[in-house]
């Protein structure tokens, strides 16, 4: 089995278009980067985008379970500039059978530059009622927690 680091430790290149007129990362980019890192993590783990996200090319039908964002936050610790190569560390956590969050830390070398959190809630796509997480996401969460000590 591949180590969780394979899908939980990623890289992000800061592009010119990610920055504002002062050459610093524009604030709204951080949450987009958090979501994109989560998408990449799922893909690296082996979960096809079409099994989680609606509207993917070639998708026969939308997933039965939707995972809307119900909470997010962002903390900016240090300025992030164009051409920075950031290491992204993901820390997913199941909160209950139908809810999870992914904390993202963006590092430049050993310095934490920014942190983000995105929380998702599982709902049936048709009824919009709460439900359990999709099995693939549940397995990703379980595999991501391997080797970590968690409280009961």
Curated annotation (Swiss-Prot):
<dbReference type="GO" id="GO:0042372">
    <property type="term" value="P:phylloquinone biosynthetic process"/>
</dbReference>
<protein>
    <recommendedName>
        <fullName>1,4-dihydroxy-2-naphthoyl-CoA hydrolase</fullName>
        <ecNumber>3.1.2.28</ecNumber>
    </recommendedName>
</protein>
<feature type="active site">
    <location>
        <position position="20"/>
    </location>
</feature>
<comment type="pathway">
    <text>Cofactor biosynthesis; phylloquinone biosynthesis.</text>
</comment>
<keyword id="KW-0378">Hydrolase</keyword>
<comment type="similarity">
    <text>Belongs to the 4-hydroxybenzoyl-CoA thioesterase family. DHNA-CoA hydrolase subfamily.</text>
</comment>
<dbReference type="InterPro" id="IPR022829">
    <property type="entry name" value="DHNA_CoA_hydrolase"/>
</dbReference>
<dbReference type="Pfam" id="PF13279">
    <property type="entry name" value="4HBT_2"/>
</dbReference>
<dbReference type="InterPro" id="IPR029069">
    <property type="entry name" value="HotDog_dom_sf"/>
</dbReference>
<comment type="function">
    <text>Catalyzes the hydrolysis of 1,4-dihydroxy-2-naphthoyl-CoA (DHNA-CoA) to 1,4-dihydroxy-2-naphthoate (DHNA), a reaction involved in phylloquinone (vitamin K1) biosynthesis.</text>
</comment>
<dbReference type="GO" id="GO:0061522">
    <property type="term" value="F:1,4-dihydroxy-2-naphthoyl-CoA thioesterase activity"/>
</dbReference>
<comment type="pathway">
    <text>Quinol/quinone metabolism; 1,4-dihydroxy-2-naphthoate biosynthesis; 1,4-dihydroxy-2-naphthoate from chorismate: step 7/7.</text>
</comment>
């Amino acid at each position: 089995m591949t180590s969780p680091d394979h899908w939980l430790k990623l890289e992000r290149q800061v592009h010119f278009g990610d920055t504002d007129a002062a050459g610093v990362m524009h604030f709204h980019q951080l949450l987009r980067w958090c979501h994109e890192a989560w998408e990449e993590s799922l893909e690296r783990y082996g979960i096809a985008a079409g099994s989680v996200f609606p509207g993917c090319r070639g998708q026969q039908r939308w997933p039965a379970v939707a995972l809307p964002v119900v909470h997010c936050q962002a903390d900016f610790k240090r300025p992030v500039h164009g051409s920075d190569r950031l290491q992204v560390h993901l820390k997913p956590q199941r909160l209950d059978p139908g809810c999870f969050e992914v904390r993202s830390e963006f590092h430049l070398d050993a310095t934490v530059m920014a942190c983000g959190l995105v929380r998702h809630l599982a709902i049936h796509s048709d009824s919009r009622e709460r439900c359990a997480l999709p099995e693939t996401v549940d397995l990703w969460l379980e595999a991501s927690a391997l080797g970590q000590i968690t409280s009961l």
